[in-house]
Each structure stands twice: as structure tokens, then as C-alpha cells.
Amino acid sequence: HLDFRRQRQMCIRDRDLGVSSFQFDSPERGFSFRFDERLDMRMNKDAVLDACDLLNTYDEGQLEKIFSQFGDFKTVESKRITSKIIDARDNNKLTTTQDLVSCIEFLVPQKVKNQFLARVFQSIRIEVNQELNALVEFLNQLPKVLKNEGIVSIITYHSLEDRLVKNFFKTGNCNGDLEKDFFGNISKPFDLVNKKPIVPGDAEIKLNPRARSAKLRIAKKRK
């Protein structure tokens, strides 16, 4: 993410969150279970922690937490995933994407395997890159770098991101807590341009299936 504290105020700001198609389609980056490559998942190649390190060093509680929080798995599901990972790494270090896939893919029926694996990989990727922390920092900096009546548009690709953006635009904070000034007016820096998120239509999804989960939210900074 960018450090907006060093930038001049802007009139328009666009933000497309998440991993790019280029990164997903680059086997050596380790973002996708479609390829058998090293577990990496770092957006910043200079970062110290990668997916391989995470999976082989995080303890049981840490792993359960990331699958529960970032994959939206139920507690029992997070425990099962974690148990299989720990059993596998006790025998051999998890090094490649297929090492991970092979130890957990049988936990669910074949018909939902891809969705299941996508959520597992998403959980690990979010933790490796501290994506939600970066998004919160970005949102908190917006009122300082966007001019009055400036426009900001953000595209999210999963519910965790979208919840943070939705809350911030509606209330001015990522928790979604309404704060009022001395006169009882809601104190928030932005007004919604579109009350509901803009989502792709069937034609766009057919052309680009990865757009299926995308949501576009637009807000305008108050004077």
C-alpha cells in the first residue's frame, strides 16, 4: 500500500484492492493452488514473512485464528484445517502449494473443493501481507489527503474488505460506530455517492469470472 501522508491533497482517489490477475497467474508467486510452486504469496517480494514460513512456524492458536478471521471458517472447521496442517508439517516441511493442498483437500466434498481451497489460500495471503491492516491505514489517511468534495472509489473482492470500506464510508470509522458532535449531528468525513455497491452484471462476469465478487463503493468528502 501507499503512504499517503507524504502526498498532496487529491480530488479523486481510486483503489482496486486485492491480488492482481497477473499475480494470480504467475505460478512462481504461489498465490494459486492451480500450480505446484513454492508457498510464497508475498505482494512485496522484499517482505520477510512468506506463506511457507507462516505455515511451518505459526502455532495451533495462530493458525486457527487466521482461518477463522480471514477465511470465515467456523471454529470446528478452522481446528480441522489446522490439525491437518500441523500433522503434515510434523512429517515434512510444507514447501509448495500442492503440499498444502494435499493435506487438506479431502476435508470437503469434491464439488466444493475449489471454494474451500480458495478460502484457505485467502486466509494465508491476508495474513502474510497484512492486507486488512493496510486497508484500515489507507482509509484512515483518506480524509487527510482528499480535498473537500473529492471523490474516492474502492473496489473490494471479499466480504472482509467490503465490511471495512462500507463501515468507514457510512460512519467514518472501520468499526461502524456512529459518532455525533455536540449538536447531535453524525460526525463523518464522507457521504455515499451510491447507497448500494455497484456489482458486475452477468455479461461482465462471463467475460471476466474473477469479477464475480467485486463491489464498487463511491463516496464524496464533505466540505
Task: Identify the role of each PLM range.
Residues 96-144, 151-223:
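C-terminal catalytic and target-recognition region of SAM-dependent MTase-like enzymes
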Residues 50, 61-65, 81:
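Post-DEXD/H (motif II) to motif III coupling segment of the RecA-like Helicase ATP-binding lobe
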Residues 90, 146-147:
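Helix-to-beta-strand junctions that scaffold the AdoMet/dcAdoMet cofactor pocket
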Residues 66-70, 88, 92, 107, ...:
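Alpha-helix C-capping/helix-to-loop hinge sites
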Residues 58, 62, 70-76, 91-93:
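Phosphate/pyrophosphate-binding catalytic cores of soluble transferases and nucleic-acid-acting enzymes
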Residues 1-8, 12:
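Single conserved hydrophobic/aromatic residue that forms the stacking wall/gate
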Residues 13-15, 19-60, 172-176:
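A mobile, often basic/glycine-rich helix-loop segment
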Residues 75-86, 121:
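Short, well-structured alpha-helical segments
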